[in-house]
């Protein structure tokens, strides 16, 4: 018995080293798994339009996913399938080229695993070419800083940098947002590339129809395989008026990283 114990004691350092190596390997493999784009409170391509100087604008974003991921996208995440998101976006026109924004609250009134939740808030600074709708070529840059609950994002603090470039080729609009997102880990190579594209046809001054594409390619240093990427194609209709602006759309996921079917509705108006 004493001989067996002696052998066991002599082997303990090797066992500990092996266990440590196994743990390190597991952590490395987990870190190497392709990231999947989390749910979003805002499904929109920015066109460099901002609130007029001195105006306060309120936009309500509502997204419903009747057919989506039935498992959490990360441990503890809200399940997308049958979930409903609602966000209030407040905007103030500071100058003809700068708009200050606040998303409060970012919420999920319903999800199958959490019920109703408050998901966090975002602060936004949007810089654009003044009176972008009057120019053939327009541009802008949007920055967002988010504070998230653990079930909305797997990191508490995240940010978005959204360049805006576009053309008004009346009656067509072509707009591209080459977005990069960060959770402040992993350096520049870990920035997530999540671009969006909109091609719109303006039927009249008040009605437009559009095709939109939203993508999530993964980190810049190594895009995830195509079948694991986030790729959603959308059909959208817009209606503008003096009292309220409406955008509604239906999106279909075309890759394994996207939800199969999502609806969006956006309502906005100036409050002063």
Regions found by a protein language model. Give the residues of each.
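Transmembrane beta-barrel domains of Gram-negative outer membranes and organellar outer membranes
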Residues: 37-272
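Hydrophobic alpha-helical segments, especially transmembrane helices
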Residues: 17-22, 270
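Residue-level detector of alpha-helical hydrophobic segments embedded in or interacting with membranes
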Residues: 8, 29-30, 158, 173
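Bacterial N-terminal signal peptides
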Residues: 21-32
